[in-house]
Amino acid sequence: MKVAIIQHVIRQDDLNWNLQHVSELMDKQAGADLFVLSETFATGFMAEGTADKAGMQGMMVLKWMQRQASRLNAAIAGSVATRDDDGKLRNRLYFVRPDGFFDHYDKRHLFSFAGETKEYVAGDRRVVVHWRGVSFLLQVCYDLRFPVFSRSRDDYDAIIYVANWPEPRRDVWQTLLKARALENQCYVIGVNRVGGDSACEYQGDSVILNAYGRAVAKCVPGKVDTAVALLDMYELHRFRQKFPVLADADDFLLASEQKFL
């Protein structure tokens, strides 16, 4: 599995420019099986009072992802602000395949510090997707701080984190990505934006870590960049069998799962 991480600038609310920018960067890694973009890659993180506009653009962005996935014969992962039939906004991570079919995960942990809880509804589903022999757990930005929600049940090979993670907390980003890889014995794909907006600057630090917590691909911090890595499933499963930490993990159910019992 060849995974390309796309570390890109986001112009706030400039949908057409952002989509063209990302498309050009993806072309540099043509041949990848999966392209991972940032959180809200087409618009930027929406502040209070502006998310309604982004919600109207959600379907446009999804259709663009479907066209790009078909053109590149690859899956594409990235989050957008979207409005469902219930009228509520969600920070939705789409995983789109070349045939147009897609899965989605709605961000579970909303960033109340930045007002996300005032605009969006939190998701309640834990989502694992399967693509070309690899299983991915989908996560968005702030979810990284809550390890119980991403705890492995031996049901995925890699975690995808897409983010708008600010530069002042870059050490947290780097530390927690490594922790998630080590504790879950999995690959971790973390993609963050670069540039700035009215709130802060973003350093990127996009990376792919293996189950040993070592970087197998990384983008240049603070720069528009792309990187690619091969996910080696044979080596991952060999490591898990040789050092079976997950067999000793605690059993648990998330609160949202109790209602299904």
Place the predicted regions along the sequence by residue:
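Extreme N-terminal starter segment of soluble prokaryotic enzymes
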Residues: 1-5
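Short polar catalytic/cofactor-binding loops
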Residues: 7-13
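Cys-nucleophile CN-hydrolase/nitrilase-fold catalytic domain and related Cys-dependent amidase chemistry
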Residues: 15, 23-98, 167-186
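Short beta->alpha transition motifs characteristic of CBS
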Residues: 43, 50, 94, 105-111, ...
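CN hydrolase (nitrilase-like) catalytic-core segments centered on the catalytic cysteine
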Residues: 61-77, 145-226
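Active-site catalytic loop in hydrolytic enzyme cores
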Residues: 84-154, 168-175, 238-245, 255
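C-terminal beta-strand edge segments of enzyme domains
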Residues: 128-130, 193-261
